[in-house]
């Protein structure tokens, strides 16, 4: 797997320089306009310093219909908490999380010492996102993000991630053939490109690096050592920053508490 190595400060400065765009490429809602959008976007990216080789990789992508289908069909976040927990296999995640907390105790102790984040929420996120690494996705990351940047629903949001992905490819931190989930997330805990630039530590296909990076993300979003992370408690806001879906946030908090020894 391609090694992911990052220099945070310079990356974010460069990413800021890449946007916003004064003349955005024309978005669309079907495959028909994707080729024309790529041509227009490529000109913008070239003007912002993206390399010819990376632009060629972008131009080689195909419209990711599976990504669009998945984006349109995210119904699990509309379930009740109990329904969501059952659908996502919460009892299995908690049981496996407890095992890993015990077997990988030194790793989690090190992470908690550095970032203040206990094992529970990290293991809950890991289990929820990829089944502890068993389901990391098999979509082309660049095609997925480019398709979503072209799609009119959230073009501005995914355009930022597309520029981040192009930057990571330019630097050799990601390969144009990188595989990931439907929305372009990569690694054991499913980082988007902008988050990789800001919080990524080493190869995110490696569990220890991904968990460390996840703890770094949570700390950067206000996690305080020793404070609670259930709804209404100080650290719940950091979980909210990880994923915008309320039912997901509550599930992570509940499973994390159970893994950490609560009920």
Functional labels for PLM-detected ranges:
Residues 13, 45, 59-60:
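A general secondary-structure boundary signal
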Residues 23-31:
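Cleaved targeting-peptide boundary
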Residues 13-23:
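C-terminal segment of classical bacterial N-terminal signal peptides
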Residues 4, 17-18, 27, 177:
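Hydrophobic alpha-helical segments with strong N-terminal bias
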Residues 1-8:
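Bacterial N-terminal signal peptides that target proteins for export
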Residues 32-56:
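Mature N-terminal segment immediately following signal peptide/propeptide cleavage
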Residues 50-263:
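Catalytic glycan-binding domains that act on GlcNAc-containing polysaccharides
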């Amino acid at each position: 797997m391609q090694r992911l190595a990052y220099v945070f400060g310079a990356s974010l400065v460069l990413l800021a320089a890449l946007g916003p765009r004064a003349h955005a490429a024309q978005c669309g809602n079907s495959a028909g306009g994707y080729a024309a959008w790529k041509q227009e976007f490529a000109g913008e990216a070239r003007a912002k310093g993206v390399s010819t080789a990376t632009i060629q990789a972008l131009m080689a992508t195909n419209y990711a219909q599976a990504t669009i289908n998945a984006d349109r069909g995210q119904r699990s976040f509309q379930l009740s908490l109990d329904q969501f927990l059952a659908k996502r296999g919460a009892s299995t995640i908690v049981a496996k999380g407890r095992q890993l907390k015990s077997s990988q105790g030194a790793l989690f102790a090190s992470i908690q010492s550095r970032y203040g984040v206990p094992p529970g929420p990290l293991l809950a996120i890991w289990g929820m996102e990829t089944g502890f690494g068993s389901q990391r996705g098999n979509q082309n990351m660049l095609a997925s993000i480019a398709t979503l940047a072209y799609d009119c629903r959230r073009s501005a949001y995914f355009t930022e991630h597309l520029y981040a992905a192009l930057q990571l490819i330019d630097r050799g931190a990601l390969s144009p053939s990188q595989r990931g989930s439907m929305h372009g997330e990569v690694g054991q805990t499913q980082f988007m490109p902008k988050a990789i630039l800001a919080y990524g530590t080493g190869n995110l296909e490696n569990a220890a690096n991904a968990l460390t990076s996840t703890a770094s993300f949570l700390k950067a979003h206000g996690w305080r050592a020793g404070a609670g992370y259930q709804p209404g408690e100080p650290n719940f806001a950091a979980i909210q920053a990880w994923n915008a879906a309320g039912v997901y946030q509550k599930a992570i908090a509940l499973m994390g508490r159970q893994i950490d020894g609560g009920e």
